Amino acid sequence: MMKFLRGITIKQTLLMASIVIMASCKSTKVVTGGTVDEKLSAKSVIKAHYQNQANFKTLNGKVRVSYSDGESSQNVSVSIRMEKDKAIWMSAPLGIVKAYITPDRVSFYNKLQNEYFDGDFSYLSELLGTEVDFSILQNLLTGQAIVDLRQEKYGIDLFEESYRLTPKLPGTLYKTLFRIEPKNYKMALQQLSQPLKNRLLEISYENYQILNKEILPNEIKIRAITKDNENNIALEFRNIELNGAVNFPYSIPKGFKEIEL
């Protein structure tokens, strides 16, 4: 664990902080299966997707993160807490690395390197190759589309036992693709790419689970590809509780050097 934490670079810390908060929950009942209906329209599938979004106030638990950048691979378990629409907090063992994210702020510190970062979402957006804000992270957390599918028209076909949605009018800078699983109409895969910049962000939801009657992601895999790098992260969520009391202990230690990006 200490070897892992010493090896964390600024880029890895920000990437892992952003990815760790892009998902949720572990319980004993995993949701699988479902049968696609070839008669459903894109509009009907999108409507069902929004009707089935999770509704909870707080989240508290742990997530096991497996990270690989092509040159090295690491594993770490972190604590995660969330108050919906307000805050996301994570902490490595002994509080050696902590992150605190609100709708207008991204902040973290690393006690091993005596450094901290406190700023907006612009660096995370650049790192992941797409615009990122608190709402997008929260949607990723709950298996919801990271863009509002109701704002444009989509074509639909069936692919690997899921509904595949592609925009009828493809974007010039960004290309998007969504796959929705048929049992609960949650995301099976989200893909955003910038072909001109050789960037790809792909989030695949391995399965879902039921927790307090809510359907939430159980395991997630993320690929973040740029022209020069490929980062792969796998998430497994454990001991998650919903709607309990949570707090977010976070204070940047005095004397730490600010990271300027």
Regions found by a protein language model. Name each.
Residues K29-R105:
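Start-of-domain marker
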Residues I21-S24:
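C-terminal motif of bacterial Sec signal peptides marking the signal peptidase cleavage site
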Residues M2-L14:
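Bacterial N-terminal signal peptides that target proteins for export
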Residues Y154-L261:
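Gly/Pro-enriched, hydrophobic low-complexity segments
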Residues K26-T32, S251, L261:
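Membrane-proximal, glycine/serine-rich, low-complexity loop/turn segments characteristic
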Residues A87-S135:
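An acidic-aromatic
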Residues N75-S79, K98, Y116-D118, L177, ...:
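Well-ordered beta-strand positions in beta-sheet-rich domains
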Residues S125-K168:
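Hydrophobic, well-structured mid-protein blocks that either form specific transmembrane helices
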